[in-house]
Amino acid sequence: MTNATEQTYLWHRFTLREAVLLCFCATFIVLTRAGLRLHLHLPGHVMFCTMFFLLLARGCVPKLGSATLVGLITSLTSVLLGMGAGGPMVLVKFLLPALVVELAGFLSPAFVTSLLACATVGVLASMLRAASTTGVEMLIGMDEEIMLRKALISAAMNGLWGGLGALAVPSIIRRLRINGLIELKTEKSGAT
């Protein structure tokens, strides 16, 4: 899919095609977050699409920094649009799951083709996101018993939704590779 003369533009790592694809994934996270602001009474439901697009970005662009870039763009856009009551804490809420996806991609570059690995990464990243709000509640002095119960429920629901969103990624990545829409390459073979 890529030409031999294709240049890297963003962070001296991503081609223009890859950067546009990563920006689309970040945009879809923001759009689904805005669309899911409905009061569904389902805690953590936003993590379904967040984990889906973070893992899809890592699967389509298997380079170090791809999920981090998606998380950074998503968090900055969310802050600029005023989405969420956390203020600058929104940066952490998107960057922490992205860093978990990056760590998983660093340890096992082909993890996006495994259902179990994707589900595990989705659950862990989503639970870490829930822990970030617990840290803020601890700093403001919330009662420990209430905070721990809320943290447990929030982590469980975020993990459930994040894991469910992650389960769709391996089949989509396989189908994209079969149809020739993305290449099977790793960090070592993708570097020019």
Regions found by a protein language model. Name each.
Residues 31-43, 74-103, 137:
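Interfacial aromatic-anchored transmembrane helix boundaries in multi-pass membrane proteins
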Residues 9, 13, 17, 42, ...:
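Juxtamembrane/transmembrane-helix boundary motifs in multi-pass membrane proteins
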Residues 111-192:
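Membrane-embedded alpha-helical hairpins and interfacial helices in multi-pass inner-membrane proteins
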Residues 2-60, 65:
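Hydrophobic transmembrane alpha-helices
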Residues 56-62, 80-88, 103-110, 129-135:
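Juxtamembrane membrane-interface segments at transmembrane alpha-helix termini
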